[in-house]
C-alpha cells in the first residue's frame, strides 16, 4: 500500500512500523514468514520483542519471495510481529500481505483466527471451510474401489467436480490424466484390474488463497465412476 500520509521530500527517509498479532494454539516446527513486497531501503523484523536475525532464504514459490524461520520466536497464545521499514519516497511501504507458512490449520472463533493442528482427514467439499482458508497447493483424496470381471468389460469413466481447479487422476499409482478445465473426466479402463483398485484424485487450487487471502472455494466436491457399454458397429 502507498503511505497513508504523503510527506514532503524533506521528510524522507523515515521509519514505518507494521505490527500485526497472531494467535497460536500451538507452534508448528516448520513455521516460516514469507517476506515479499517491502518497498524501502531496509527493514528490521521483530517477533515478540526479539529481533529476527536469521538470513532470509529463497521460498518455494518465487526467487524474489524470501522466508525466515519463526518457530523459535513464537509462543502459544498471542504473538506480535513487528516490521520496521525505512522508506525513502512516497510510494514506499508495505505493498503485499505478510504470510505465515507451515504445517498447520487455521480455526476461527468470535472473529479471531488461530493457528491450530492440521485436521486428520478432510471430507468431500470445500477445504476452505475445513480450517484451510489460506491453503494453496495440492490435496490428494484416496479411495479403494473393488471391480469384478463384468464391470471390467465396460468402459469406465471417472468424473469429478473440483470447481475451477486442476484435477490429477491416478489409478493404482499411475497418472492417468491431468485435467486443467471442464470436463473433469478420465477414461480409467486401461488402469484398473479385477479386485481392489486404489483411486487417487489430486486437487490443485489457485495461489490466490495464499498470496491474497481470497478464500476461493477449493476441494473435491463430488466424484463417481460411470460405466458405459462397449459396442462395435461394422459396415
Q: Predicted segment positions?
A:
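Aromatic-lined ligand-binding clefts that engage carbohydrates, nucleic acids, or primary amines
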Residues: 20-49, 81, 145-172, 199-201
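Aromatic side chains
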Residues: 18-20, 134-135, 141, 184
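An acidic-aromatic loop/edge-strand motif
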Residues: 1-13, 37, 58-143, 155, ...
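Solvent-exposed beta-strand/loop surfaces of large extracellular or lumenal domains
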Residues: 40-67, 164, 170-185
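Generic structural detector for well-ordered beta-strands
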Residues: 21-23, 69, 105, 144-148, ...
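Generic low-polarity alpha-helical segments
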Residues: 22, 33, 43, 104, ...
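Regulatory/sensor and coupling segments of signal-transduction and defense proteins
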Residues: 6-11, 18-24
Amino acid at each position: 500500500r502507498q503511505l497513508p500520509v504523503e510527506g514532503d521530500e524533506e521528510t524522507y527517509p523515515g521509519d514505518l512500523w507494521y505490527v500485526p498479532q497472531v494467535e497460536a494454539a500451538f507452534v508448528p516446527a516448520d513455521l516460516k514468514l514469507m517476506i515479499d513486497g517491502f518497498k524501502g531501503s531496509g527493514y528490521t523484523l521483530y517477533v515478540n520483542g526479539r529481533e529476527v536475525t536469521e538470513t532470509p532464504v529463497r521460498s518455494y514459490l518465487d526467487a524474489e519471495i524470501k522466508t525466515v524461520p519463526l518457530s523459535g520466536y513464537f509462543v502459544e497464545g498471542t504473538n506480535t510481529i513487528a516490521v520496521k521499514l525505512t522508506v525513502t519516497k512516497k510510494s514506499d511501504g508495505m505493498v503485499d500481505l505478510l504470510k505465515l507458512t507451515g504445517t498447520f490449520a487455521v480455526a476461527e472463533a468470535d472473529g479471531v483466527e488461530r493457528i491450530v493442528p492440521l485436521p486428520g482427514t478432510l471430507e468431500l467439499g470445500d477445504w476452505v471451510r475445513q480450517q484451510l482458508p489460506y491453503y494453496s497447493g495440492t490435496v490428494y483424496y484416496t479411495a479403494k474401489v473393488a471391480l469384478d470381471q463384468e464391470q471390467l468389460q465396460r468402459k469406465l469413466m471417472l468424473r469429478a467436480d473440483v470447481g475451477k481447479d486442476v484435477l490429477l487422476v491416478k489409478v493404482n499409482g499411475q497418472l492417468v490424466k491431468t485435467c486443467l478445465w471442464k470436463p473433469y473426466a478420465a477414461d480409467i479402463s486401461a488402469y484398473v484390474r479385477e479386485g481392489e483398485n486404489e483411486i487417487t484424485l489430486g486437487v490443485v487450487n489457485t495461489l490466490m488463497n495464499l498470496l491474497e487471502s481470497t478464500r476461493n472455494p477449493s476441494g473435491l466436491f463430488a466424484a463417481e465412476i460411470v460405466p458405459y457399454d462397449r459396442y462395435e458397429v461394422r459396415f
